[in-house]
């Protein structure tokens, strides 16, 4: 009973949002808990996050003003693009990806889990994409820069060679020109940061 147009797994790169909803549904069935309860148990509590939660601002986008109090749809969240956070919470999550899955003193991901997230699964389709991460390579063809552009002008990134990461939030954002901000970060800002870090350390990573 395949949906019309469905292609075999691993045969094509086809980015979309429905797969995240399906993964969330599977997690709910396996654990017997709601997505909100799962996120609280495995992410919010062990990382001591203050704001981070999933909702569905897309159901009434005009009513969402970017604040936690205006978020709706927590009972049936949009998993692909429905999470909100502050900078402190986001920093904890990014740091966990750089520290082998450790968030403070609590492990939220196994080392194997972190590696699977960062594995390039679409190279044969001329794309560099893992599980949620877009992947860039160093001059010696080593994967090291993992980045993820958000729906509202945010781009998170980690540099596994240097052990650093960051988050860029864009105040004046338009989806029609989103690539300009992303390209600015990836091709201009991050190289400047890499150079500054290398210079400060007195050596290449």
Spell out what each predicted region is:
Residues 117-119, 156, 192-198:
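A short, hydrophobic secondary-structure junction motif
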Residues 1-148:
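Short, surface-exposed loop or secondary-structure junction motifs
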Residues 138, 176-205:
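Short, gly/Ser/Thr-rich active-site loops of penicillin-recognizing serine hydrolases
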Residues 144-146, 152-165:
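Short, surface-exposed beta-strand/loop micro-motifs that present aromatic residues
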């Amino acid at each position: 009973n395949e949906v019309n147009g469905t292609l075999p797994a691993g045969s094509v790169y086809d980015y979309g949002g429905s797969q995240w909803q399906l993964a969330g549904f599977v997690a709910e069935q396996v654990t017997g808990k709601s997505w909100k309860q799962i996120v609280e148990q495995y992410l919010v509590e062990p990382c001591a996050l203050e704001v981070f939660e999933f909702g569905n601002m897309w159901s009434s986008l005009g009513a969402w003003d970017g604040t936690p109090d205006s978020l709706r749809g927590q009972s049936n969240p949009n998993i692909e693009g429905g999470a909100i956070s502050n900078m402190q919470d986001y920093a904890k999550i990014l740091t966990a990806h750089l520290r082998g899955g450790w968030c403070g003193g609590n492990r939220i991901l196994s080392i194997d889990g972190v590696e699977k997230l960062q594995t390039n699964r679409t190279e044969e389709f001329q794309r560099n994409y893992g599980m949620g991460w877009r992947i860039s390579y160093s001059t010696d063809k080593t994967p090291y820069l993992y980045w993820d552009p958000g729906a509202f002008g945010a781009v998170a990134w980690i540099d596994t060679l240097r052990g650093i990461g960051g988050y860029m939030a864009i105040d004046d954002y338009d989806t029609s020109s989103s690539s300009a901000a992303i390209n600015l970060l990836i091709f201009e800002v991050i190289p400047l940061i890499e150079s500054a870090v290398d210079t400060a350390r007195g050596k290449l990573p």
